[in-house]
Amino acid sequence: MNAENTFSILNTNEPNAGGSQVTESEIEEEDIEFLSFAALKIGATSSLSNSSLGLPEYSNLFAINNLKSLFVAGVPNYLIIGSTLDLQKSLIDADENVDANVLKDSASIRHVSLPDAKFSMVSFSSNGEFVIAYDFVSFELSVYETDALLKNSATSIYKAVFPDLVQVLPNPEINNLVILRNLKLEVFLLSLSKFQVESPLAKDATCAAWSRRGKQCVIGFNNGTMSQYTPAGEIKLRIPRPPSLENYFVECISWIENREFVVFYSPLTSLSNESDEPPHESECFVISVGMNGHFNFGKAGDPTPPFGAVNRRDHHYIASLHAWKPDLRSLVVVANTASADLGVLALSMEKNQWSILNIVDETKRASLPYSNKKDSDSSPTALVMDFTATDRISKPLDPTEAPADCSPLPIVWVFNDEFQLVAYRIFYADAISKSIDYPEMNVIKDKNKDSTVRASNNENIPTPDKQASPFVKNLSSTSSPFSQSSAFGNFKFGQATSFDKGLSTDASSGAKSNTPVFGQPSTFGQAPVFGQPSAFGQAPVFGQPSAFGQSSFSFGTSNMNQKLDFGTFKSPLSGAATGEAKTNLEKAVTSASGKASFTGFAPSQSTTSGLNFDSIPKDNEAASIFGSSQVSTKNTSGFQFSNNTLLADNVDEDIESDHDTKIEELANSDVEPSTEQNIGGDVSWGASTFQSKPQPSFSFGLTLDDKSNTPGKNFSIFGKTAETQVEQKKPENNVLTKPFSFAPSDKSMFAANIPSAGEGLDQQKTSKALPSTGITKLSENDNEKAEESNETKGFNTTIAKQNDKSSKSEGKASVANMSALNKSTNNETSDSKPSLKSPLFNFSADAPTFTFNKPSETPPFSFNKPLVEKESKQDVSDTSDRSPFSFKAFGIDSKKSPTPEPTEMAESNISEESEGWKLIEQPNVESEIEDQDEESSDLNGKRRSTPPKIHEVGVNKMLDVVPKEKRDLNSFFPKQPLVVQSTDKNKKEPQESLEDEILSAEGFSEVEAANKISRFEPFSSPKLKLATSDNAPEKYVFEESESSDLEEGPVPLRNLESLADLPEAESNEKLPMVNTFERLYLQFKNELDLVWQNINIIAEYIEGQTSTPSAVSEQATMAMLSQNTEELEDLLDTVTSFSAFCSDYSKQIDYLEACLVRINAKRIQVTRLLKALTNPAFEKQMELRQLGPEALRRQKELRLKMEKVLKSLSTLEQQAVDARMSDTRRFKKPTLGSIEVAYSRIATLLGQRLKQLYKLEKDIKRMATKKKMITKKSMSSDMMTQFRALGISQSSTKQVSAHYLREFERQDAFRNGVFKRLTSLKKAD
């Protein structure tokens, strides 16, 4: 990057001048309940056509213009246009659980007939004045006036042939600019003002998208890369492909924010795949472009997995919401041609990170309507956001929860391939509970303004006047811009075309208008020469009052009321006008460097007669820091720069959110951007490390209230600044820098956050500072003065010898006059000499420093968490040794070389009894009662082995400065039983009377004294005694002998097992896929158990290290300060590293647990899939299964079918009843069972009758053989009976035979009829 220009990375002539760094991360899935979708009418859809026409994958057949509250839909043979409010009402009033409610024609909804039209794309222009439609059969692109369509007029104002268009994308702001993309992977720009197309803007392009303001477009290519273009064809930025993808093309792009893109990639093989089952392997990435050319690819997989109409190739539809407080910075809704559900991505304001939202309640998700015709899922052909709703919603959250109602909510419309519409309201619970409306809903309410409204920041963008509309050409003429050449063939980029010859006839009279011709400079509102008045309004010279509301800047002004055409379009934040109308400042910069640099990133605008896209506002014209644009009186733009910040040229200023605005303000800052509200203001030194809040780990002297980071001013421990030199002296004796703090070296680390009582005494005593450690070194003269005046400096300085009487009297006096002395001490100046009775610490309620009877809320060396809330910025150079948080307050000084040697040692005062005495219940900060020349104990309470030495401190003097209620050291410092009693049982207690006197004076009992201060006592005495010699009756006599039996070794660290040594898991499942998932699940579980085992071992080791008692074998001295500091810093680094390690491990464990849950769910899913593949019945059940309102509708349909079946069975039963098989006289209606019984009986009777006939036949044949006439006499009585039963009279044999045959046939026919009837009844049953 150019060191002279920090914005060299943004140089438009070198899109990748700064290089690029590419990283890839994973976007996590989040289960949420704060967001939900609710249908306008559960189970209701609106049908716009009953056609079954097949549509291409790249269809977009529904659009909404929120400014005009209009919708348009393309269906076979019709364009349907009307009011969105009536469309919402028609769906709310529709019938439930009906295949589709037909949208009827009305006064506000028109079905414009267009015979043989088969549309694949429809859309509005940015201001809603025109409707653009494309017929994928005839390849005709048609433009209609919206007003004409509302009057049911099918006359187009423009029509041209464009073969194989797959994308028609109007500019969201510029009303007459449209992107066209065809199957040849070419991208063109169509100007609706001239109906002309230039040479391809880009080739090998697979998708395109406008920025939210339409100043730039981004084009994706078949190699996976993307590029940002201006409408003039200038490349602003090149975006590489994700590192993990190869042989993928850019399938869909949505430009969400300035530097945020949601992009879908698909395999290259799907471009040429024409099979019925194309591959569905799309990948979703959220691309974040950093200020320094860094690209981060957040992988989100595919939020809309292919569980739907899988016969269609992947094509995604994206709609988004922005800046919905309190936490939704961006909400992206995604639909996929191969998915039946909608996916959701969100960017959080608080976390500043993307996530895939998984709505926990399945009934609150959004899905496409089910296709009853095909008995399968439908596929989307459009996804649109609607901000025009006006009805308030009652009980939006829950019938029992507040609020009772809420403002209208955004609506997302989904149009499927069966021309059915379904709509869902988007409920954001956090915003509803706080009564926060979606901002664009409020903007639409004010849409009656004459200018285009910017939804996200209420900017007013001027739109072309109706009289200056280019669509006034008499289209009845046979001449057409496309009559002489093809739309795509014979143009060269930059070649002079009819594009420059504007249509300037008036709409009503056909007269020539004054609207400037596209590509020619406009004299009206032209930028004047610097220092000269403008042509309109006579803007005065800088500093004089402006005329006609003009800016006081005399250059670069523009007229907000000017009627503009496409070629002369200006944003209210734009700079110079089109063509040659450039500011002198920009010309000067351009001519000096030969190319635009720093203030003019774009190249010089050409004055040729070709297609002049330079007239479109550039990004760097959005907000000129030099005042080259006239800004409206109420500037609502989110981009406001300080004097030392510049706008990046390659950034499209489409985002008005606070976050990105403040990132822009920090473009020239060394501090990393943050989402907090204090960005761009006073940024403290810790902001780059801890983002929103500075978090120095152990800097006790810093406060967030003090923000004067002024060189040359240092901060004292008393909260006041002291003028010092900017350059600090080099630390003496190689003292380590920043031993306990992550703060800069000029910040104090051990300064008190509250002024102490000795502030007045030490304010003028400026000593040489050790700037990195916060240790104050006293000069020898200062020590001599302190020694002469017997002035005590905390608990760390050597106290001069005092006689018995003076010490006792001073102790009693100091206890009696403590509060009075505190007040007098606070008022003293450095010139006054403190008295001997003046205490060093202020224990009053007004200015507390040390509190010994209550644990501190944040101990000085707490490793739990750093102090971040109540720290004050202090400088070390003014740190006095009287500060209770300085090292001297703990009896610790720097190395021996800068510290004056003590003038007297008390080795001669060692009594004969000293060898038998040891310390009991000694607090871990022993330096409070030790001489500064002796070795102090470690901060963790351990002691090192050193030769026995004498420690002498005036007891009465020590007790004098500590009030009664503050003398409990045990509540502040943990006790450690480090001593035992002496073995000499015959020794007397020479100081018993002294001890009793002290205890009685202070009101302590002997037991209480054992808990308050350190004592010396022989083995034989049950009391705590003070042991002294005759020579030093008022000194503690102490000797510590080495005791090896007290030392306990630290708890050893057990060996940790490695994940690499973990054996592979095995599964007993037989199915291969289930076996694989089972092994993966078990492997994760074993690894997780091993990780927990290792963590427990480490925790046990740490607990053992902190709780293992050990004897102090060596006494610390002030000379060991540097070593102790280094050890403490190393320990701090270790603890910090371990804390970070534990945090990382915890995150990994949480991630593993989440993975286990997902694997378990995936296992169940795979099991179901295998079952579905092997069980046709289960597969049918899965096809019938739908979620949410769709399931209710289908369930009702199933119930209706069941009712029909039952009704049919009832009808059949009625028909069987009507058969009336017997007892016709009483009209008895037999049942099926009774009929079967009757049939059995009839069959039995027929069998008996048949036997009788056979017997009769046999007798007749026997009689006939005798050739005799059968007479009455020749017949037996049985035969006569049979004849009578059969109704046969006496006749000849022939007559008998004929009658027999007729009777037999009749009975056989009757039996066959009954049998057939029963058979039919059984089949019906």
From Swiss-Prot:
The modification Phosphothreonine is found at T899, T946. Keywords: Cytoplasm, Nucleus, Phosphoprotein, Transport. The modification Phosphoserine is found at S1041, S1043, S1044. GO terms for biological process: protein import into nucleus; ribosomal subunit export from nucleus; RNA export from nucleus. The keyword Nucleotide-binding does not apply. GO terms for molecular function: nuclear localization sequence binding; structural constituent of nuclear pore. Residues 927-937 have a biased composition (Acidic residues). Residues 1-20, 453-474, 758-951, 973-994 are annotated as: Disordered. GO terms for cellular component: cytoplasm; nuclear envelope; nuclear periphery; nuclear pore; nuclear pore central transport channel; nuclear pore cytoplasmic filaments; nucleus. Its main location: cytoplasm. Residues 763-778, 792-801, 816-835, 850-861 have a biased composition (Polar residues). Residues 779-791, 802-811, 867-881 have a biased composition (Basic and acidic residues). The keyword Nucleotide-binding does not apply. It is found in: Cytoplasm; Nucleus. Functions as a component of the nuclear pore complex (NPC). NPC components, collectively referred to as nucleoporins (NUPs), can play the role of both NPC structural components and of docking or interaction partners for transiently associated nuclear transport factors. Active directional transport is assured by both, a Phe-Gly (FG) repeat affinity gradient for these transport factors across the NPC and a transport cofactor concentration gradient across the nuclear envelope. This is Nucleoporin nup146. It comes from Schizosaccharomyces pombe (strain 972 / ATCC 24843).
